[in-house]
């Protein structure tokens, strides 16, 4: 089995259909995308004991305490830790991924993400906050990073004629994982309890991601799509005549400009995600029955996830025609205008306008994620794009805290 994980064992033959690779990437990204749905766990994790901690119990004491409940602010740190370790893992293991191949990285991601959720289950059983952070945060975060970058360079090499479409397909599932995971998690919590849910979902994701990883193939050296002539395509914006090595990419101003672009885009998107649902409930409170406003707000949250998914494939594939630079110019100009308009729509209780504004912002949030790998390939070449993309994702780590 271990031999079948090696990169030289997954080189595709001439009869292989390149469209078999995107579904494999989708299985992995739909699994790790559940990190966006972790909000369903916070209420359950704050009432495991049934007794509130007194004001004299410090933050550090709550990390190990078993006699009273954690605060919501304690457990939500799990998400921030996971995003930080996503960026760190992507940066540290990106170069290893290029050598080891996507299948080995995908299996490692499955073990870390699935195993991390199982460790979290243990933390719930023992009521140890540090185990929650270690499981879903640190171990799971490493799985997120490995899983996130595992298909990127592979799909770019399979689709050199449509790099934007390729990265959109690779990253699309991450935005939609919560749409599947949240209803499943909610059902399992009601049926089994939150601790058991973490274990069951960890096992499900471990199996699903492993199956996805075994669907990965890499093209043979020199392969290109039938009928595609790279010489005829005058879109070469590379800063060098050859592929830029990962150890040199971060020494260029282009890398840091793209790093800043990603950080700003993600910070803005997280800023909207963090307030959109409660803000919607506030502005819509006078227009809907209080008994159904919660359900409507949940539906609004699902719409945001859908916009995130659509934006990843729409903007990334559109960038193949618009150009990467123009696409990001649209993100910044239109995004800034809409970001400033959202509070205005909320204050004046323009519900439909507020919903439309936030949905468009979320499409650009997802599109920014999905288009950046293709932009990197345009500038630095495809040979080390996975490793370079991994290092660029440290911007996500910072944005996860700032946003």
Identify what each model region corresponds to.
Residues 77-97, 302-315:
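Central cavity-lining transmembrane alpha-helices of secondary-active solute carriers
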Residues 36-45, 166, 247-317, 373, ...:
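Extracytoplasmic gate region of multi-pass secondary transporters
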Residues 174-223:
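Helix-loop-helix hairpin linking two adjacent transmembrane segments in secondary transporters
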Residues 30, 116, 129-146, 263, ...:
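Hydrophobic core of transmembrane alpha-helices in multi-pass small-molecule transporters
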Residues 45, 144-159, 166-167, 366-380:
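Intracellular juxtamembrane helix-capping segments at the cytosolic ends
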Residues 41-88, 289-299:
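Extracellular/periplasmic helix-loop-helix junction of adjacent transmembrane segments
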Residues 111-125, 333-347:
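C-terminal ends and interior cores of transmembrane alpha-helices
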């Amino acid at each position: 089995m271990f031999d079948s994980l090696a990169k030289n064992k997954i080189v595709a033959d001439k009869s292989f259909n390149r469209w078999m690779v995107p579904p494999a990437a989708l299985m992995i990204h739909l699994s790790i995308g559940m990190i966006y749905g972790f909000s369903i766990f916070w209420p359950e994790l704050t009432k495991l004991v049934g007794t509130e901690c007194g004001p004299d119990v410090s933050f550090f004491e709550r990390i190990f305490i078993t006699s009273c409940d954690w605060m919501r602010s304690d457990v939500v740190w799990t998400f921030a830790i996971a995003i930080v370790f996503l960026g760190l893992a992507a940066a540290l293991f990106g170069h290893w991924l290029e050598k080891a191949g996507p299948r080995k990285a995908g299996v490692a991601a499955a073990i870390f993400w699935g195993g991390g959720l199982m460790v979290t289950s243990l933390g719930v059983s023992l009521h140890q906050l540090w185990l929650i952070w270690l499981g879903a945060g640190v171990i799971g975060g490493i799985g997120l990073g490995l899983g996130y970058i595992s298909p990127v360079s592979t799909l770019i090499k399979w689709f050199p004629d449509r790099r934007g479409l390729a990265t959109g397909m690779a990253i699309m599932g991450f935005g939609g994982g919560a749409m599947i995971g949240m209803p499943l998690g909610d059902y399992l919590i009601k049926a089994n309890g939150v601790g058991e849910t973490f274990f069951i979902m960890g096992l499900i994701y471990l199996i699903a991601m492993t199956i996805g990883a075994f669907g990965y193939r890499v093209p043979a050296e020199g392969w290109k799509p039938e009928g595609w002539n790279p010489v005829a395509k005058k879109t070469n914006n590379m800063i060098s005549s050859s592929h830029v090595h990962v150890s040199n990419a971060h020494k260029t101003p282009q890398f840091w400009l793209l790093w800043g672009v990603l950080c700003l885009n993600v910070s803005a998107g997280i800023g909207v995600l963090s307030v959109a649902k409660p803000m919607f409930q506030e502005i819509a409170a006078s227009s809907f029955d209080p008994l159904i406003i919660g359900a409507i707000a949940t539906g609004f949250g699902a719409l945001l996830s859908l916009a995130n998914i659509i934006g990843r494939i729409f903007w990334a594939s559109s960038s193949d025609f618009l150009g990467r630079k123009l696409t990001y110019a649209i993100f910044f100009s239109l995004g800034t205008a809409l970001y400033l308009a959202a509070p205005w729509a909320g204050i004046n209780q323009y519900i439909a306008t507020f919903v439309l504004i936030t949905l468009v912002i979320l499409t650009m949030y997802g599109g920014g994620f999905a288009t950046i790998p293709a932009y990197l390939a345009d500038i630095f070449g495809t040979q080390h794009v996975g490793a370079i993309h991994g290092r660029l994702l440290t911007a996500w780590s910072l944005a996860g805290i700032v946003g």
